[in-house]
Amino acid sequence: MQDLQRYVNEILKESGNKRVFSFEFEGRKFWLKRVEKVIKGGILTKIFKPDPYRSFAAEIKKLEILNAANAPAAKLALKGEDFFVIEDAGEPISRLFKKSEDENFKREILNEAARALAGLHALNFAHGRPALRDLAYKNGEIKFLDFESKFFSDDLELKKCRDLLVFIHELFRQQASNELVTSAVSEYVSAGGEKIRSRSLELTQKFRFLYYLLLPFKFLNKKDLTAAIRTFEYLLPIVKTKK
């Protein structure tokens, strides 16, 4: 650890104003992130954006809590007042999914992601926005990155439901087929997520009016909009079968 600390001290001096960058130490890859000392944007952004040091300390605290619980999250290797270092967690699933033309591989990687999400929820954590770019794959393991800022807020069950719905939306956003989505959701349920799936279906039914508001704009062919419509069109028939 002391050797890593000394090495990091040196590269901090040499890295200029880089906020996030990777480096290798003793044959292993790490990522270093610095606090955002200069807040970019207009005057309102600077007034209302949370104190960067407080937000940064909260980000470190999240990682410490997740690591202590052995949750599927990036491992904190080193921390300081204005920086932290995590072990490399692998390649983003979004990139792996886009690069591959092998449907079996796509199914396998999405199923792994679904099981990891269920595992995170089983430990009573929620991510907040499990986009595929925030899930990394390495050596057969999935790790979550960039947990939402409201990590410590209440109503954990609702946050888990939001995770699952965002995850399904993200799969459609990446143009996954209904078959791949069904396989991933089944893996989530098999890994202990039935209660959250049921509650998520209830929420889909409760907010189904949004589907009818969005549908007339389908012709715009916007990625997030199309994914939202596909999410409703996938889940609403399932809701009907549960009645």
Where are these regions (language model features)?
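Conserved protein kinase catalytic/activation segment
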Residues: D134-F144
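ATP-binding glycine-rich loop module of kinase domains
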Residues: E10-I11, G16-F56
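C-lobe/activation-segment region of protein kinase-like
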Residues: K143, F147-K243
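Conserved hydrophobic alpha-helix
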Residues: L66, L117-L123
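The N-lobe alphaC helix and its flanking beta3-alphaC-beta4 segment of protein kinase-like domains
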Residues: K49-A69
